[in-house]
Amino acid sequence: MVSIYFFFFFLLFYALGSFPTGLIIGKLTQKKDLRLVGSRNVGATNASRILGFKWGIVVFLFDFAKGLVPAIICLRFKNFKDLIFINGCDNRYKDIAICLLVILPIFGHMFSIFNKFKGGKAIATSVGVITAINPFIGLLGILFFVLLFIFVGYASLASIMATLLVDLLLFFINHHPGITNISQNQILYFFIGLSTCFIILKHHSNIIRLWQGKEYKFSFIKKRK
C-alpha cells in the first residue's frame, strides 16, 4: 500500500502544476489579467501575444519546468518508488502510481486549484514531462512546434500536431531513458494518451476557429509600408 509520502507528493505535484505562471507574471509585470485579454488563456502563447515575446518565453520555461521536475523526481530517483510505498505492494500498482504522479502536473495546469479549476492547455507542461521521459523526443517536439508555428502562424495547430507527433514517437521508440521497465512503459503510454485527449479537448474552440478561418494568426514577417 502507499505511504503518507504518496499523498504528500500527490498534493505537491498537483499544486505545482496548478501554479498559474502566466497569470502571476502578467499581473506583476504589466498589471494585466491574461484571463480577460487576448485568447483569455494563461499559457505561453497568450502571454507572448499580450505581454510580449520575452515574457512568453519566461512563462513557457516556468510551465515547462512544472512538468519536467516532478517527472524527473518520479522516474530518475531510484529510491523514490520505495519512499512512497510500504513493502508488500505489487510492482504493477507501484508503476501505476508513479505514472499518475508523472502526469499530475499536466492536469494541475489544466484544472488549477488557484483558478477555480480552470487553466491552460498544458502544452509546455506536457513537453516538460515528455522531456523527462525521453529528452530527444521532447526536444524534437519543441523543434517541430517552432518550425510549424513559423510556417503556418497558428500556435494552436502547431501545438496539436506536435503533441500527436510526440505521442507517435513515444509509442514507436521502445527505449526511453526515464523508464525502467516494460510495465511502466505501457502504463505511461496510457496516461500520456489520456492527457493528449484532454489537450485536444482543451483546444476545441481553437479547432472550431481554424475550421471557420477565424483563428488568430501570428505573423513573423513585418510588412513594408
From Swiss-Prot:
Gene Ontology biological-process entries: phospholipid biosynthetic process
Pfam families associated with the record: G3P_acyltransf (PF02660)
Membrane topology according to the record: Multi-pass membrane protein
Pathway the protein takes part in: Lipid metabolism; phospholipid metabolism
Key words of the record: Cell membrane, Lipid biosynthesis, Lipid metabolism, Membrane, Phospholipid biosynthesis, Phospholipid metabolism, Transferase, Transmembrane, Transmembrane helix
Enzyme Commission number(s) of this protein: 2.3.1.275
GO molecular function: acyl-phosphate glycerol-3-phosphate acyltransferase activity
Swiss-Prot/TrEMBL catalytic activity: an acyl phosphate + sn-glycerol 3-phosphate = a 1-acyl-sn-glycero-3-phosphate + phosphate
Any single Gene Ontology cellular-component annotation: plasma membrane
Keyword Cell membrane: yes
Superkingdom as given in the UniProt entry: Bacteria
Ranges that cross the membrane: 6-26, 55-75, 95-115, 135-155, 160-180, 187-207
Main subcellular localisation: membrane
Locations listed in the record: Cell membrane
Known role: Catalyzes the transfer of an acyl group from acyl-phosphate (acyl-PO(4)) to glycerol-3-phosphate (G3P) to form lysophosphatidic acid (LPA). This enzyme utilizes acyl-phosphate as fatty acyl donor, but not acyl-CoA or acyl-ACP.
Assembly information from the UniProt record: Probably interacts with PlsX.
Family named by the database record: Belongs to the PlsY family.
Name the UniProt record assigns to this protein: Glycerol-3-phosphate acyltransferase
Protein source organism: Phytoplasma australiense
Organismal lineage: Bacteria, Bacillati, Mycoplasmatota, Mollicutes, Acholeplasmatales
